[in-house]
Curated annotation (Swiss-Prot):
Name of the protein this chain belongs to: CTP synthase
GO biological process, one term: pyrimidine nucleobase biosynthetic process
Keywords in alphabetical order: ATP-binding, Glutamine amidotransferase, Ligase, Magnesium, Metal-binding, Nucleotide-binding, Pyrimidine biosynthesis
Residues that coordinate or bind Mg(2+): D81, E151
EC number, as in UniProt: 6.3.4.2
Molecular function as annotated in GO: ATP binding; CTP synthase activity; glutaminase activity; identical protein binding; metal ion binding
Pathway stated in the Swiss-Prot or TrEMBL entry: Pyrimidine metabolism; CTP biosynthesis via de novo pathway; CTP from UDP: step 2/2
Enzyme class: ligase
Source organism phylogeny: Bacteria, Thermotogati, Deinococcota, Deinococci, Thermales
Region (Amidoligase domain), start-end ranges: 1-277
PROSITE patterns: GATASE_TYPE_1
Residues forming the catalytic site: C391 (nucleophile), H522, E524
Subunit: Homotetramer.
Signal peptide region: none
Length: 550
């Protein structure tokens, strides 16, 4: 940590973030923002998300229920908050950064079956709580973190959270008061009728937290508007928290305002003080510039996302953030027009895409809306509108090209039509013997070898890159030569897969189009505010150019 070189190693610091009153207050953004403030002070920080559900991971959950499944470099299917952490901290995390009840109990049961508990009666305390603490410490050690920020999902009072709350309570006993900090995020509703903030729910939430042995050191009050100083003093008095340790987190227009807002109030210094750290002035220049561009863009461009889960934007969270990052890079605001892919099957496409300058088809599964996505890809190809296809979006582009350019009538994916006469998209051979769904796809970072002279090579500026993946199907290698003869450009492959010379098709594009790109990977998972994804930067740049021409 910061300090003199001869001071010796300092103990690791742990910050635990809990939530009260209601769920979905934004603990993930608070965790990410605090991590960003600490990183801006020069500390090595990591963040861990605890999800109290019994699922082992988020991989098999419905997007409408849980939002996006975020994939880490090591192939873990995790909660979408892990994506927030990676973006705000500008670092790759791992499967250990997302801890679930399912993982903990599965591990403890397996240890008991192996006889590791030496005939003990296995109980929540100490065996489950010890497993939780061990996993948190393991991540901290592996990632050489000086400060570990741990978000406990759910709401204080939920029965599922109790073992985790007990585990984090024990951390103070194990590590000492100066090395642990409890931060509680809670709702302070504002009643329009009486024009007042109501603090009673927060008082009850803190009382519930105290009931499990945790006295919060810092409170962050979520509200639709800034919570005034006199209300914060009242909350401090009735919750036994220092007055200077109660902060306001009002609703803001842009997520990247949150770190700046909290720093302005002194949250970073309060955390330093509580953990016995020296005061450091953070370097927040990037965040300040990003917010300035978001609030005062030089241009605005509208992108259509033709997807399946358009009523649940969180299902495409990293995609939206990647577009935002690309907008910042291009000093532009990116507006999204949500288009239900199923509606495109019979829609007037001129009307559906009337006011957009780019069409994006995201990843997804299942047959619903597929033909609408195919029509969207055809419209983009024929009208020379910038097109970006992600994962399934690449496969859609190949299906459309095969049918309408290569003359392969009825071409399709075997995922949607097992009896198609031309299976231009087929199940990967490695997937034929796979049983079960959880964690069985081609996941995580895989290399892409990029062909020189292509659009993709111009975007990345290099011949090999790593991108995240999450798929079971691929472009059928038996059709690649024919598609290339018809004019499709295979601009990237994964080298050496299954011993084939050509490798798995990773990217396709068109020569006679200003920007038509399909990627089998999910580059949005690696896009960061400070390091935006090259395909997204190029896509937004092309959309801006199209808008100017139009």
């Amino acid at each position: 940590m910061n300090g003199s070189a001869d001071a010796g190693p300092r103990p690791r610091k742990y910050v635990f973030i809990t939530g009260g009153v209601v769920s979905s207050l934004g603990k993930g953004i608070l965790t990410s923002s605090l991590g960003a403030l600490l990183r801006a002070r020069g500390y090595r920080v990591t963040a861990i998300k605890i999800d109290p559900y019994v699922n082992v991971d988020a991989g098999t959950m419905r997007p409408y229920e849980h939002g996006e499944v975020f994939v880490t470099a090591d192939g873990a299917e995790t909660d979408l908050d892990i994506g927030h952490y990676e973006r705000f901290l500008d670092m790759d995390l791992s499967r250990g950064n997302n801890l679930t009840t399912g993982q903990v109990y599965l591990s403890v049961i397996q240890k008991e079956r192996r006889g590791e508990y030496l005939s003990q009666t296995v109980q929540v305390i100490p065996h489950i709580t010890d497993e939780i603490k061990e996993r948190i410490r393991k991540v901290a050690e592996e990632q050489k973190a000086e400060i570990v920020v741990v978000e406990v999902g759910g709401t204080v009072g939920d029965i599922e959270s109790l073992p985790f709350l007990e585990a984090i309570r024990q951390f103070r006993f194990d590590e000492g008061e100066g090395n642990t900090l409890y931060l509680h995020l809670t709702l302070v509703p504002y009643l329009e009728t009486s024009e007042e903030f109501k603090t009673k729910p927060t008082q009850h939430s803190v009382a519930t937290l105290r009931g499990v042995g945790i006295q919060p050191d810092i409170l962050v009050l979520r509200s639709a508007r800034p919570v005034p100083e006199e209300v914060r003093r009242k909350v401090a008095l009735f919750t036994n928290v220092r007055p200077g340790h109660v902060f306001s987190s009002p609703t803001v227009e842009h997520l990247y305002e949150v770190p700046l807002l909290l720093e302005e109030q002194g949250l970073g210094r309060a955390v330093e003080r509580a953990l016995g750290l020296e005061a450091v002035i953070p370097n927040l220049a990037f965040w300040q510039e990003a917010v300035r561009v978001l609030k005062h863009p030089e241009r605005t461009v509208k992108i259509a996302i033709a997807g399946k889960y358009v009523k649940m934007p969180d299902a495409y969270l990293s995609l939206l953030e990647a577009l935002r990052h690309a907008g910042i890079k291009n000093r532009a605001r990116v507006e999204v027009k949500w288009v239900d892919a199923e509606s495109l099957e019979a829609a007037d496409l001129d009307e559906a895409f009337r006011d957009v300058s780019g069409i994006l088809v995201p990843g997804g599964f299942g047959v619903r809306g597929i033909e609408g996505k195919v029509r969207a890809a055809q419209y983009a190809r024929e009208r020379k509108i910038p097109y970006l296809g992600i994962c399934l979006g690449l496969q859609i582009a190949v299906i459309e090209f095969a049918r309408n350019v290569a003359g392969l009538k009825g071409a399709n994916s075997t995922e949607f039509d097992p009896y198609t006469p031309h299976p231009v998209i087929d199940l990967m051979p490695e997937q034929l013997e796979v049983e079960g769904l959880g964690g069985t796809m081609r996941l995580g970072d895989w290399p892409m070898r990029i062909k020189p002279g292509t659009l993709l090579h111009r975007l990345y500026g290099k011949e090999e890159v790593l991108e995240r993946h999450r798929h079971r199907y691929e472009v059928n290698p038996l059709y690649v030569d024919g598609l290339e003869r018809a004019g499709l450009v295979v601009s990237a492959t994964t080298p050496g897969m299954r011993g084939r010379g050509a490798g798995l098709v990773e990217a396709i594009e068109l020569k006679d189009h200003p920007f038509f790109l399909g990627l089998q990977s999910h580059p949005e998972f690696k896009s960061r505010p400070m390091r935006p994804s090259p395909p997204f930067v190029g896509f937004v740049e092309a959309a801006l150019a199209y808008q100017e021409r139009a």
